[in-house]
Amino acid sequence: GVSFSILSGLQGLSIFGPAGTREWFESLQAAYPNLERMESRVQELKAMDSFSIKGFDIFAEEALHSVTALAYRLEAEERVIVYSGDTEPSARVAALADGSDLLIHECSFPEPFDVTNHTTPLKLGNMLSNHDLKRVVLTHLYPQAEGHEDEMAQQVIELSGAPTIVGWDM
C-alpha cells in the first residue's frame, strides 16, 4: 500500500471506490491522525458509473467478490487499461476488458484450487478466450501460488491467446 508518511504530505486526495469506501476511509482517518488533516474527497461508485478526471475517462463495472467490488476501465489517448480488483471470473469484467491494451487481473490461486471470490488461471483463460486483449498481468497471488507463477501465466496464454505475465508487489 501507499506509505502513510507520503499520504500525510499530500494537499488533497480524491478517492473513488464502491459503496463502503467512505466508511473505510473514515476509519483510516480515525486510526491515523495525519490523514484527518488532509483534505480529501471520497466518491462512492456503482456499476455502470463513469466519470472523467485529468484526461482519463473511467468506467466502473461490477466485480464478483464477498463484498461490494468494482472493476475499472481507464481510457486516455487511445490507450485502455482495465483493473479487475478482487473478483471471481466475470463476464462483465471480461466485456469491460475487451479491446484493452492491458488487463490487470487478480489470479489468486494455481490449479487445481477450487475457490470462490477469486480467480484461477484456467477460469481466467476461459473467461477471456473470446475477447481481444493485448496483454494480461496477473496480480494478487496468494502464497499457494508461489513457485507456480510461470505455469499460471502459460495457462492463461494457452486459453486466451493474450501475452500474459505475473506482476509483483513491491
What do these predicted regions represent?
Residues 1-83, 88, 95, 150-170:
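Binuclear metal-dependent hydrolase catalytic cores
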Residues 89-170:
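Cap/insert and terminal regions of metallo-dependent hydrolase folds
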